[in-house]
Amino acid sequence: MKLSDFDFDLPSELIAQYPSSERDNSDLLIAVTPLIKTKFYNIIDYLKEGDLLVFNNSKVIKAKLNLGKNITINLNQKLSDDSWSAFAKPARKLHVNDEFYFDNHKVIITEKLAMGEIKVKFELNDISVFEFLNKYGEMPLPVYIRRSHSLCHPVATTTGSKTYLNNDWIPWSNHGMTNTQNDNDRYQTVYSQIEGSVAAPTAGLHFTKDILDKLKAEGIQATFLTLHVGAGTFLPVKTENIHEHKMHTEYCSITPDTAEIINKAKQEGKRIIAVGTTTLRTLESSCNNGIVKAGSFKTDIFITPGFKFQTADMLLTNFHFPKSTLFMLICAFAGFKEMHELYKYAIKEAMRFFSYGDATLLCRK
């Protein structure tokens, strides 16, 4: 199939710039005939006792670092305990061996790669990289979230290749806000546990602790796996022949307990509902002859129409970009024609798209 087969017109005003007033107050589109548009807090009405929801419990880290002088880096993947790959903007302003000081901590540019990618090393005093990011980093909101407020950045003093950043913050000029205290809460699922993602597994953002409690009370099961979402999730497909596209790799983990719960539910004929494309990709990557295997691994699975699914019966997901690998995935899962029609309906109904947008519950075709 061609990349253009997965295109559709999306009005820019439907790209959600902020989360809904409450997590569960977003809209939910149920993919039945006819389509049902409801509120997410009603999701329990479309599930039944014995269903198994599988969640991604990865926690978003504050992966965005302002280096001063209008330079930012967004961490991508952990390479070792003290080294990460990252994307820099603008990368042309950075050089190998540049050093950036945050109080008594240091970030060093160790390598420059193609397409704005770099490698960095953290030299920290008595704290972990995650602790450092919690203090100095920002929530890495997607680039399509553009806001009119001013964003602050640290005052920077440069001597040679060394830049010192202090806690006196001044506003960027002509830059949109990418982080607020509200984002620190709302761009994180309520059940997140394991730090490592640089983008949210967004289907889970709609769940509240109250909804999770109600699902449990109704006999609807829940279990958790981990996929650390990388920045590559936002990379566009640039080849017209979609099968020439190279997927990014991401770290996944499924515990023996989770694998046992999923396999038991499958054997008993219970419905498996994947909460998000990250969960579905992890399940399919781990499955062999219909059996989900426990373990830690990296996946670059690219799911397109014609893929033979072995795990989930239903998929809860947000609305995705035209021509994206995730739109291709849902076309594979729930039908090419059906998803184009569903998206036309969602656009007509002014439903909100992407990370802070609305959700849809799909059945496997």
UniProtKB/Swiss-Prot annotation:
Q: What is its EC number?
A: 2.4.99.17
Alphabetical keyword list = Cytoplasm, Queuosine biosynthesis, S-adenosyl-L-methionine, Transferase
Q: State the Gene Ontology BP annotations.
A: queuosine biosynthetic process; tRNA wobble guanine modification
Which GO cellular component terms are attached? Answer: cytoplasm
* Pfam families on file: Queuosine_synth
Q: What terms describe the molecular function in GO for this protein? A: S-adenosylmethionine:tRNA ribosyltransferase-isomerase activity
Give a yes or no for keyword S-adenosyl-L-methionine in this entry: yes
| Location in the cell | Cytoplasm
Pathway(s) the chain acts in: tRNA modification; tRNA-queuosine biosynthesis
Q: Does the keyword ATP-binding apply?
A: no
List residues traversing the bilayer. none
Reaction equation(s) it catalyzes: 7-aminomethyl-7-carbaguanosine(34) in tRNA + S-adenosyl-L-methionine = epoxyqueuosine(34) in tRNA + adenine + L-methionine + 2 H(+)
Give the record's subunit note: Monomer.
What NCBIfam families does the record point to?
PRK01424.1 (NF002398)
What does the sequence similarity comment in the record state about its family?
Belongs to the QueA family.
| Role according to the record | Transfers and isomerizes the ribose moiety from AdoMet to the 7-aminomethyl group of 7-deazaguanine (preQ1-tRNA) to give epoxyqueuosine (oQ-tRNA).
Q: What is this protein called?
A: S-adenosylmethionine:tRNA ribosyltransferase-isomerase
Q: Which gene encodes it?
A: queA
